[in-house]
Structure formats: C-alpha cells, structure tokens
Design a protein with these regions (language model features):
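Structured interface patches
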Residues: 1-171
Length: 171
C-alpha cells in the first residue's frame, strides 16, 4: 500500500485501500481483505497519517478450542518527517524520518503491525465461554460432561466437611 506524496498539495487527503492479508504476510486466520481508510494531512515537510483498519478472521478459542469469526478494528497514527526538519514532536514511536525528495510512502508494514497488535492476547469465542472439562475434554459450552464431580483426593476432605457445615448453617 503506497501513498504518492511527490507533488502533493498541503492539506488533508483521503485514501482507501483493500488488501489481501496474505500480501502483508499474515496467517491463514484472516479470511477477507483488510480495509484501510487513511487520512493524510500534509504541511510543508511533514505528513500526519491517521488510519483505521478493519479485517475479519477466524480464530481458535483459547478456552474451548472452537473456531469462531471475529472482526478486528484498530487505528493508528504516524508522523512522517523529512530529514533535517524540525518537527517538535516528543514521541519517537510515532515518527518516521523519510529522505528528502521521497515521492512514495509505503504503509504496508505499519498496517501489518497494527493488525497483529489488534489481536487480543486471549481469544475467546464469547465472554461466557466455559472451556473444556479438565478430565474428559468435553466442551462445557455444549452441556455438562459425564465426569464425576466428586474428588478422591483425601487432602480436601476436611475442607469439604467445613463447606457442607457452612452451607447447612446458612439454611
């Protein structure tokens, strides 16, 4: 995804890109093209790019391992400043210095990184996902499993007696 900046007039310019995630080196989890809507504000020797990215994917739930679809949406902004220009900006993470005379800015890598950072650390099919039974592996979202709920671990026997007594006292 390249934005032509050579000869671009000062002001705000709108762009829309549609790209196959495979072209960005993203995994087979992404099922549809990514949509990138960008606004580029040019003023003399600097460019402010604000982008919103939407992409659909199919992921495995971290609790129940079921496949589920998810729409990811994320935004980022980046300042592109020509070499030697005084930009007056404090956050170097959002600044890229570009050579004088550059005519094209390639935003592919920034878009790729933004998509990867928008994937949650813990992917859940839904907030109430019950996961898998730790004994038999049954998906608890589909109903109860047939495992015994009693424990044969005698270390917890006295605690079970106290719990039962506490429940009886409340009644």
């Amino acid at each position: 995804m390249k934005i032509q900046v050579g000869g671009l007039s000062d002001g705000i310019h709108q762009y829309r890109f549609q790209i196959d995630p495979a072209e960005l080196g993203l995994s087979e989890n992404f099922t549809e093209d990514a949509i990138v809507e960008a606004s580029l504000d040019k003023s003399s020797n600097q460019f402010l790019l604000k982008s919103t990215i939407r992409v659909s994917g199919t992921f495995d739930c971290d609790r129940c391992i079921s496949r589920f679809p998810r729409m990811l949406q994320s935004s980022y902004q980046m300042y592109y400043v020509t070499e030697g220009a005084d930009h007056g900006l404090n956050d170097p993470a959002e600044i890229q210095v570009i050579p004088n005379g550059l005519t094209v800015i390639d935003i592919s890598d920034d878009v790729r990184q933004t998509i990867l950072l928008s994937i949650p650390l813990k992917l859940l099919c839904n907030d109430g996902c019950k996961g898998l039974c730790p004994h038999c592996g049954a998906n608890l979202n589909n109903g109860r499993c047939t495992c015994s709920t009693t424990s044969d671990d005698l270390r917890w026997e006295k605690l079970a007696v106290l719990q039962k007594k506490n429940l009886n006292d409340r009644s």
